[in-house]
Structures are given as structure tokens and as C-alpha cells.
């Protein structure tokens, strides 16, 4: 049964008159998949309701933050109490100290952390700090890894290691990105060549340990190990961008997953967001004390923000971290996520469709490919036309996945076995149609 979208269409047309493209973040516009975006009216648990009061099982969760599901009672209570005390002060609070202490307790690679308001702000500030701490200018990033929309990071791979990267957005002058070196993800040979050529100039290597903006592609253990070795050898800082993976794939973030495979492994700097705010605008970056003390007011690297450490956002984040720290939380979350990906794969395979899937904790991805891709070029081989059919088929059946082939999905603690079974059943029906 196709759900009625009339009220969503009315709102979308209204929005387009006053907001560019009708949305405040491009992926929400359904441009990749076509059709009308769903305008959310309310959300609770594993579900949201659109402008037509149609219910959807939500596998986006605000693109990751809603690990407990929408409207968790403990989080709502904490936020309501904080609101009654005041929205914003522009002055320090005890709660921001408590949140920083909790983050550092759970992620021991950092001695200090600075709170900001968005992942882009955190990544941008991390690069500035890395450059200030090392006295170097160049940074390495990988094609397909997304670190927010700061100018220096909006770069795609150039035509070889010796060339500058090319801006991927209008409005970014080439000279702004001339210090950004873009490499292929999971390519150790290319990584070694880049350090051999420019190692003494590299301030930092920034990477997503699991890339959530080319769907779900994880860094191989040998690749992460070599990144660590080369950064140490050449005096560059290894930055783990855990805006998406932090507290989403494991209590200690993705770095704790790699530490199980690489003895003594730690990144030098960590970027965090999403889950640490529990759905509020909150992000952070941190490192060892020797690096963080380069930040103003102690050092000469300037960073500031009017709403940094906002008292309502920190209340939301602190309540969320306390809930996910409870024993057995991640084991249960991972089981639910695996049951989803296993069910989807079995349903697709039964219809003769190419399908591969992967997950870690409460984060997952799938591809209409026989094998899991290892880099952006391989991801691009996925069947986008068939994905669009799958997306709309699920949407019509009340299941909301990312409206783009290159985005990861998220499971929350609120998703039940019944939710997963219903989702797999819906997917099975769609697979039968699109396999013909």
C-alpha cells in the first residue's frame, strides 16, 4: 500500500519558497532517490510520524545520535530539568565539566576535551590545533571520508599524489585546499608513498575508522596499523574522526575496536559528536594534554563558541552516556543490528540479488554488490537505480532508511525483535519486485 504524502508535498513546496532546496541539509531533500521528503511531526522510541500522521520505523535516528531511540524517559527528564534552570549562559557550568569527565573516562586516549556545537566545528578546530601543535601545514584525508563542510576538507582526490586536491564545492578557492592531500582509503602503498614524499610537512592524518558517508566501509586492521606507524615515524598526528562512530559502535568508540586487534593502539586526537549530544547540537575534540594545551586561553591556537558547552545540550548528552554505559547495552544493540543485516541479506539472496552487509554495534550498511567494498571507487559500483527502488518500496511500507546510497544506517535500543522482523518482511516483498 502506498502511503499518502499530500501534506508532506504541501510543506515541501512551502519550504522551498523560504529555504534553499526546501531543506536545511541537502540529503533531506530526497534528491538522490526522487520523491517527496517526509516532514517529521513527532517521534517516539523507534518510530516517527510524518505530516500525514503515517508511522515509520526509523533507521536513521537523526543520522546517528538517537542511540536510545526517540524520547527516552531518562533523557527527557534531564533535558526538562535543565531547561527550567536556563537555556544558555555564555559562562562555565558544572555540567560541562561532568560531561568532559565522563567522555575522558570512556575514551582514555584523551587527557582533555573541548566541547563545541557541531561535528564540522570540531573537525575544523582539530585541524587548526594539529597545525598549531606541529608547526606544519599539510593534512591527509581519504576519498569518501566526510569530516564536515570546512573548506580544507571539501576535497576530492587529485590526479596523483604530487598534485593538489580539487575543491568539491563551488566557493572553495584552490589555494585553500593546496595543503590537503587526498588518498584512497585502505590503500597502504599509496599511504606509504605520500609520507615518503611529504612526511615532514604533514601535520595530521584525519580518517574515519568506519566511513559512514560512503555507506559503511571499515578501515582494515593492517591499514589502521600502518597509519599509526607512519604518523609516529614522521611526527604527524593521527586523528580519528569518531563523530559518527563514537559511542555508536562501542562504548569506547571505534578506536576501542581497533585496540583489540592492534596492541597499545591509540589515535593522537579524536573528534566526536552525534551520540555525545543525545540529539542536541553538541560535539567535541580531544587529545593528550601536551596537544590540547596549545588551545587558547592556555596557548596560541584560537577556538571559541558562544553556545559551546550549552547547559541543555550537556544535560542531554550526559544522560545519554549514563544510559549507554549500563552493562550489556552494546551487546544487546549489536545483536539487534546483526539480526537486521542478516535478515536483509538472506531475503535478498533468496531472490538472487547481489547483496552484502556489515555492521558494528548500532551502525550498519548494505550494498547491492556481491562483496563488501573497501574504498570509494568500489562503493560507486553499487546499483543506484535498484537502491532507489528499494528505498521507495520500503518507504511505502513504513520503513525509513537513508534516502541516499552512500549513507550508513542506525539501529537504536528502542528497536524490538518485532520491528526487525517486520522490516525484513517488508524488504523481502520489495526484493521480490525489484529482482524481476
Swiss-Prot record:
Reactions that this protein is recorded to catalyse: (S)-4-amino-5-oxopentanoate = 5-aminolevulinate
Catalytic activity, EC: 5.4.3.8
Disulfide bonds: none
Secretion signal, residue range per the UniProt entry: none
GO cellular component: cytoplasm
Subcellular localization, as worded in the UniProt entry: Cytoplasm
GO biological process entries: protoporphyrinogen IX biosynthetic process
Pathway listed: Porphyrin-containing compound metabolism; protoporphyrin-IX biosynthesis; 5-aminolevulinate from L-glutamyl-tRNA(Glu): step 2/2
The protein's required cofactors: pyridoxal 5'-phosphate
This protein's UniProt keywords: Cytoplasm, Isomerase, Porphyrin biosynthesis, Pyridoxal phosphate
GO MF annotations in UniProt: glutamate-1-semialdehyde 2,1-aminomutase activity; pyridoxal phosphate binding; transaminase activity
InterPro entries xref list: 4pyrrol_synth_GluAld_NH2Trfase, Aminotrans_3, PyrdxlP-dep_Trfase, PyrdxlP-dep_Trfase_major, PyrdxlP-dep_Trfase_small
SUPFAM superfamilies: PLP-dependent transferases
N6-(pyridoxal phosphate)lysine PTM sites in chain numbering: 274
Annotated family: Belongs to the class-III pyridoxal-phosphate-dependent aminotransferase family. HemL subfamily.
Oligomer status and interactors: Homodimer.
Protein's recorded name: Glutamate-1-semialdehyde 2,1-aminomutase
Source species: Albidiferax ferrireducens (strain ATCC BAA-621 / DSM 15236 / T118)
Gene name linked to the record: hemL
Amino acid at each position: 500500500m502506498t502511503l499518502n504524502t499530500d501534506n508532506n508535498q504541501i510543506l515541501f513546496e512551502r519550504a522551498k519558497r523560504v529555504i534553499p532546496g526546501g531543506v536545511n541539509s541537502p540529503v533531506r531533500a530526497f534528491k538522490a532517490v526522487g520523491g517527496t521528503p517526509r516532514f517529521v511531526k513527532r517521534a517516539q522510541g523507534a518510530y516517527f510520524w510524518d505530516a500525514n500522521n503515517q508511522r515509520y520505523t526509523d533507521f536513521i535516528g537523526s543520522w546517528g545520535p538517537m542511540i536510545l531511540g526517540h524520547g527516552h524517559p531518562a533523557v527527557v527528564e534531564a533535558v526538562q530539568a535543565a531547561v527550567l534552570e536556563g537555556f544558555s549562559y555564555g559562562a562555565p557550568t558544572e555540567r560541562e565539566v561532568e560531561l568532559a569527565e565522563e567522555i575522558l573516562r570512556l575514551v582514555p586516549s584523551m587527557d582533555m576535551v573541548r566541547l563545541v556545537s557541531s561535528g564540522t566545528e570540531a573537525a575544523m578546530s582539530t585541524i587548526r590545533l594539529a597545525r598549531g601543535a606541529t608547526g606544519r601545514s599539510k593534512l591527509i584525508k581519504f576519498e569518501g571520508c566526510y569530516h564536515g563542510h570546512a573548506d580544507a576538507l571539501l576535497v576530492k582526490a587529485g590526479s596523483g599524489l604530487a598534485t593538489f586536491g580539487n575543491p568539491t564545492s563551488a566557493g572553495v578557492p584552490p589555494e585553500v585546499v593546496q595543503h590537503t592531500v587526498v588518498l584512497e582509503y585502505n590503500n597502504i602503498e599509496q599511504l606509504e608513498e605520500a609520507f615518503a614524499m611529504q612526511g615532514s610537512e604533514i601535520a595530521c592524518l584525519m580518517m574515519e575508522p568506519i566511513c559512514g558517508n560512503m555507506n559503511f566501509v571499515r578501515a582494515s586492521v593492517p591499514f589502521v596499523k600502518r597509519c599509526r606507524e607512519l604518523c609516529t615515524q614522521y611526527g604527524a598526528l593521527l586523528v580519528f574522526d569518531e563523530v559518527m562512530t563514537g559511542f555508536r559502535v562501542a562504548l569506547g568508540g571505534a578506536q576501542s575496536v581497533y585496540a583489540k586487534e592492534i596492541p597499545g593502539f591509540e589515535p593522537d586526537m579524536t573528534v566526536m559528536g552525534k551520540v555525545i549530544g543525545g540529539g542536541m547540537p553538541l560535539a567535541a575534540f580531544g587529545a593528550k594534554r601536551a596537544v590540547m594545551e596549545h588551545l587558547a586561553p592556555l596557548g596560541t591556537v584560537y577556538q571559541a563558541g558562544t553556545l559551546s558547552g550549552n547547559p541543555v545540550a550537556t544535560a542531554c548528552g550526559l544522560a545519554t552516556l549514563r544510559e549507554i554505559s549500563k552493562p550489556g547495552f552494546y551487546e544487546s544493540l549489536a545483536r539487534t543490528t546483526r539480526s537486521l543485516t542478516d535478515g536483509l541479506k538472506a531475503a535478498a539472496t533468496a531472490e538472487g540479488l547481489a547483496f552484502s552487509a556489515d555492521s558494528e554495534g548500532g551502525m550498519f550498511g548494505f550494498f547491492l554488490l556481491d562483496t563488501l567494498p573497501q574504498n570509494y571507487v568500489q562503493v560507486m559500483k553499487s546499483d543506484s537505480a535498484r537502491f532507489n527502488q528499494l528505498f521507495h518500496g520500503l518507504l511505502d511500507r513504513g520503513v525509513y532508511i537513508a534516502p541516499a546510497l552512500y549513507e550508513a544506517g542506525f539501529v537504536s535500543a528502542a528497536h524490538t525483535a518485532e520491528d526487525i522482523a517486520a522490516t525484513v518482511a517488508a524488504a523481502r516483498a520489495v526484493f521480490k519486485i525489484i529482482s524481476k
